[in-house]
Amino acid sequence: MPTTLETAVAKYLRSGNPAQRTREEYSTTLRKWARWGNTIPIENLGRKDIRAFLDWVYEDAAGRDGGNPGRTANKVRSHLRAVMAWAWEQDMVGALPRFPKVKPHRVVAGRHYLTKPELNALYFASHQMTRPRGWSEPFSVGRYWRSALVVFFNYGLDTGTVWRTETFHEPIRCRHVSWDRQSPDREVKEQSPWGWLFYRRLKTHKAFYRPMNRTVHAHIKNIMPDDPDPEAPIFLGGGTRPNKRFRTLCGLAGIGPKTNIETGEKQPWVLRDLRKTCATYYDEHVPESSVEILGHSAGGVTYRHYAHRAPLAFRAIMTLPQPSAFAALSKGFDGQCPCCRRRFADG
């Protein structure tokens, strides 16, 4: 028996027990669907139908108040995609339809990601980081932070995966790095010429074997001791409060606090924002790739489907355009500006 969108939404909401505000938003989407007047069952819902509905939502919103029709259409798109992804997981539909791109819209919320010029500024400002009291490590603290910025950008890691600040954190250790082309996970068919990195998400404890691209490879090599202890953490210099040092780094880079548009409140950037930055640039590069790379469960898609997304994640990681500053090391310009060759003095 064909499944209507109304039935699918009701089952989807019952499965997740969302907040009342979320339920109301989905009800609004269903009212728009009813006013559109097309009763296509979800089994037959395709990209062409979805585009037609979203175009109607956009035009309807523009005709009613004209405030921000793109945002309205994109909100409806996110609801449809979440329901269809859940229906796919439940085997209610044979395949997840491709969705049209999001529509241009006026940003009404604060920006929660860092731009590439800001990442460049952070990277170069790390040369100004002062030596912490009692620092006796072989490399400057700035060198560790430059490598950390690179892995935050490329993998969207949790802070506790880079620097262990709590007893339950599992940081990346020297034994978690493999320089082989073949992944330590033998189920992974792809081969990486730059090696592999293992880590585990704090929230879900899910293990990941990720390929290193050229930029990550160069920065991991740059902080790896000649005779590494397999149990030693790779990244040092976070201290007991990495976010405090990150705020200092933002100050050195001349990056002001972000602004909450609703309240006007100034809020400092935190390391979690680098995770949001990672998701932003991955989805810009390869749409939907951040779901797998960050280890999210989006729209009810569970990990049993992620095996099919592994090639997508591999391609996204290996081809992600990097901030220009990140290329300085791999091009042989470590410690100097790649454009003017001005040398930086590490603290």
Predicted segments — roles?
Residues 168-179, 265-268, 285-307, 334:
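Short, polar N-cap/turn motifs at the start of nucleic acid-interacting alpha helices
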Residues 150, 154, 160-161, 273-297:
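C-terminal catalytic core of tyrosine-transesterase DNA break-rejoin enzymes
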Residues 74, 93, 99-159, 163:
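Basic, Lys/Arg- and aromatic-enriched nucleic-acid-binding interface segment
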Residues 211-266, 283-286:
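Active-site/catalytic core of tyrosine-dependent DNA strand-transfer enzymes
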Residues 32, 40, 45, 64-101, ...:
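N-terminal DNA-binding recognition helix of tyrosine site-specific recombinases/integrases
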Residues 1, 174, 180-187, 226-229, ...:
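C-terminal secondary-structure termini that scaffold catalytic or DNA-interacting sites
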Residues 101, 155, 164-222:
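Conserved tyrosine-mediated DNA breakage-rejoining catalytic core shared by Y-recombinases
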